[in-house]
Amino acid sequence: MLIIRNKQALKEAILKETQVNKTIGFVPTMGFLHEGHMTLVKHARKENDVVVMSVFVNPTQFGPNEDFDAYPRDEAHDAKLAEEGGVDILFVPSVEEIYPVELATKLHVIKRVSVLDGADREGHFDGVVTVLTKLFHLVNPNNAYFGQKDAQQVAVVSGLVEDYFFPVNLRIISTVRETDGLAKSSRNVYLTDKERKEAPVIHAALQLGRQLIESGETDETKIVQMMTDKINEQTAHEKIAYLALYAYPDFTPVTDWSKGIIIAAAVKYSKARLIDNELINVKRR
């Protein structure tokens, strides 16, 4: 496995592969890898000749009240997992490598971000599309891999790819979970033992919402209240940041219950904010 920190070296390494018609699969991450990331790598390995992974904690997607410096990092651990998983090129740039000068232009997301994380974390998705635009240009992948757990991000990135004609196929992979249903996340390490035992109720509540909708329930207030009650009864969280359902991928109010719907939750614990979702009537790519 090649570990590359320099943009030019990355482009040269990838050009060497594409000149002999090899396909490139790309897994962008912020590091502190876990089984969820490695599932993306597994799919990329199966579907491409060359697998490129980036590990970059992107400062532009952190808000003023979010601690960029405290985000967990472990490069040695990440490199070990990446190599064991079959990554060919690991791109680990510095902030200065990706943002060498102050940006003269800025991407701004105007749709699919007025609710959920888009509303809760102002400017977050602007940072996401900015760094992905840079990375897509550097890697020029045939396929890029994202997890369903970040469903709003997936919808935003799909819009980016469609709007700016990026020649990349987005591959969306189902959320990887612990045996008790908790979605795998780098932030799970911040949960106390008690919080960790209780946190799987988030997924259980979302499944309840799915069951209600699939059984014909269309009273949105009732669905959300039943899910809220389930979470409040079974876990001592700090607050529910959001628990809602929307049409997917547009994140507008549901008007047709036979089309794509997302039920999404964000629950704040003492030192961790966990997100999860269920997609209904959505065909995965």
UniProtKB/Swiss-Prot annotation:
Subcellular location: Cytoplasm
Pathway: Cofactor biosynthesis; (R)-pantothenate biosynthesis; (R)-pantothenate from (R)-pantoate and beta-alanine: step 1/1
Active-site residues from the entry: H37 (proton donor)
InterPro entries: Cyt_trans-like, Pantoate_ligase, Pantoate_ligase_C, Rossmann-like_a/b/a_fold
Presence of keyword Ribosomal protein: no
Main localization category: cytoplasm
Binding, (R)-pantoate: Q61, Q153
E.C. number(s) listed in UniProt: 6.3.2.1
Catalytic activity field: (R)-pantoate + beta-alanine + ATP = (R)-pantothenate + AMP + diphosphate + H(+)
Keywords, sorted A to Z: ATP-binding, Cytoplasm, Ligase, Nucleotide-binding, Pantothenate biosynthesis
Binding site for beta-alanine: Q61
Class of enzymatic activity (EC top level): ligase
Keyword Cytoplasm: yes
GO biological process: pantothenate biosynthetic process
One Gene Ontology term of the molecular function aspect: ATP binding
Family to which the UniProt record says this protein belongs: Belongs to the pantothenate synthetase family.
Quaternary state and interactors: Homodimer.
NCBIfam families attached to this UniProt entry: cyt_tran_rel, panC
HAMAP family noted in UniProt: PanC
Protein purpose: Catalyzes the condensation of pantoate with beta-alanine in an ATP-dependent reaction via a pantoyl-adenylate intermediate.
Name of the featured protein: Pantothenate synthetase
